[in-house]
A protein has these predicted regions:
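Single conserved hydrophobic/aromatic residue that forms the stacking wall/gate
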Residues: 1-11
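Loop/turn elements at helix/coil->beta-strand transitions in domains of secreted/extracellular proteins
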Residues: 8, 58-63, 134-138, 174-180, ...
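A conserved hydrophobic secondary-structure block that centers on an alpha-helix together
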Residues: 25-66, 71-73, 78
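Alpha-helical scaffolding within the catalytic cores
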Residues: 48, 118-130, 159-167, 192-202
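Substrate-gating cap/lid alpha-helix
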Residues: 65, 184-216, 228
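Acidic, His- and aromatic-enriched active-site or binding-groove loops in soluble protein domains
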Residues: 80-104
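Surface beta-strand/loop "capping" patches
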Residues: 230, 241-290
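C-terminal beta-sandwich/jelly-roll accessory domains of carbohydrate-active enzymes
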Residues: 267, 273-376
């Protein structure tokens, strides 16, 4: 179908890491493409389905500039000056400045810098700075795998997200530039880094004018799930609701708000109720189906010893109440905090999945200890 039907036009930037910021891109290196069967194979499927949903609802064409680069950590996309002004990130800048790249991985929140593209600001300089201050309506972001793999420390990722969003808003001269991102999906049981990184992404929502598409229910053995439709369309709910006046649209699934201890139980409150909570299931790219006779899964509680135990969970009105016979004095609760939780089934009635969460970040493992083999 042509862009007159889908309403989508695309533009991809050339790949080349540069140390100083590029100020212009040669005309022959970049051009808008009308959506067609021939142009889609080389373009981001998530971006396409995002743009198509927005265009279909607004009735106007939507253009997307793709500035992605697969398999790269977030550091390369952040303006280098943002590292200098943030306490949590300054050690990275100092080591890179002194050409001690191998030592970056040993830092709290460290990352393996495999090539120059992973150095602070390098991808930003070549693929973001040349576009600014183009009058973009917002940004969508799908990344995190390369900050949560073997040898990477996902702690501090939320501070990197803050630096990313703030830096882009500065260069686009828009302090309220909407920024929507994808939370990492389900992947592998041993992917402890992904557990912590998903939580870091959830905590990044403290930034104003941001939104997160939850994908924990889109299980796939591939690091990049084949179901791009749900990812893109869930992202599209955010601008439709927050920017384009579709206030009746629910833009996200249930997000952890607070937890209250009541004797041997914990009562959990959520934002983004979307008409109420429900137990449901989703098979592949099919619709979400309510399953009221099924128990809620993947809730766990812990006492002061920080040992997690499976918990029974029940929906009571707009809250979830959890308890476990193994924990008489609970202090923390978590949901879907595994590398690949099978059938996480808490949704709102808009058909959107609840985000994984942990009420106490100190209790959440982030890697396998190389000495003991346990988690840390």
């Amino acid at each position: 179908r042509s862009s007159l039907v889908t309403g989508v036009q695309t533009c991809a930037l050339p790949i080349c890491p540069d140390s100083p910021s590029l100020r212009d891109i040669k005309r022959h290196e970049i051009a808008w493409s009308v959506d067609s069967q021939s142009t889609r194979p080389g373009y981001s499927a998530v971006a396409f389905f995002f743009a198509r949903k927005v265009a279909n609802h607004l009735g106007v064409p939507v253009g997307v500039i793709e500035s992605s680069w697969g398999g790269k950590p977030i550091e390369g996309f952040i303006p280098s000056e943002e590292f200098e002004t943030r306490e949590a990130l300054r050690p990275i800048a100092e080591l890179v400045r002194n050409n001690k790249l191998k030592e970056v991985g040993a830092l709290e929140g460290g990352v393996i810098i495999r090539n120059t593209a992973g150095m602070p600001g390098r991808i930003f300089n070549s693929r973001i700075a040349p576009v600014a201050p183009y009058a973009v309506a917002g940004a969508i972001w799908y990344q995190g795998e390369s900050n949560a793999g073997k040898g990477e420390d996902p702690r501090n990722y939320r501070f990197k997200m803050q630096a990313l969003v703030t830096g882009w808003r500065k260069v686009f001269r828009n302090p309220k530039l909407p920024f929507y991102f994808v939370q990492l999906p389900s992947y592998r049981d041993e992917a402890f880094g992904w557990i912590r990184l998903r939580e870091e992404q959830r905590l990044s929502l403290s930034l104003p004018q941001t939104g997160m598409a939850v994908t924990i229910d889109l299980y796939d053995t591939d690091i990049h799930p084949a179901n791009k439709i749900d990812v893109g369309e869930r992202l599209a709910l955010w601008p439709l609701s927050q920017q384009y006046g579709h206030s009746q649209r629910v833009c996200g699934g249930p997000l952890f708000k607070s937890a209250k201890v009541e004797g041997e139980t914990m009562r959990i409150q959520f934002d983004f109720l979307g008409g109420g909570l429900m137990v449901a299931t989703k098979e592949g790219a099919g619709p979400v189906t309510e399953t009221p006779a099924t128990d809620l899964q993947h809730f766990e509680i812990a006492g002061a010893d920080a040992v997690w135990h499976p918990a029974t969970a029940e929906i009571e009105s707009e809250e979830v109440v959890v308890q476990s016979p193994s924990v008489s004095r609970p202090v923390a609760v978590r949901y879907a905090c595994h590398g690949a939780p099978q059938n996480p089934n808490l949704y709102n009635r808009a058909g959107l999945p609840a985000s994984p969460f942990c009420s106490n970040l100190a209790f959440l493992p982030w890697s396998v200890d190389p000495v003991s083999g346990g988690t840390r």
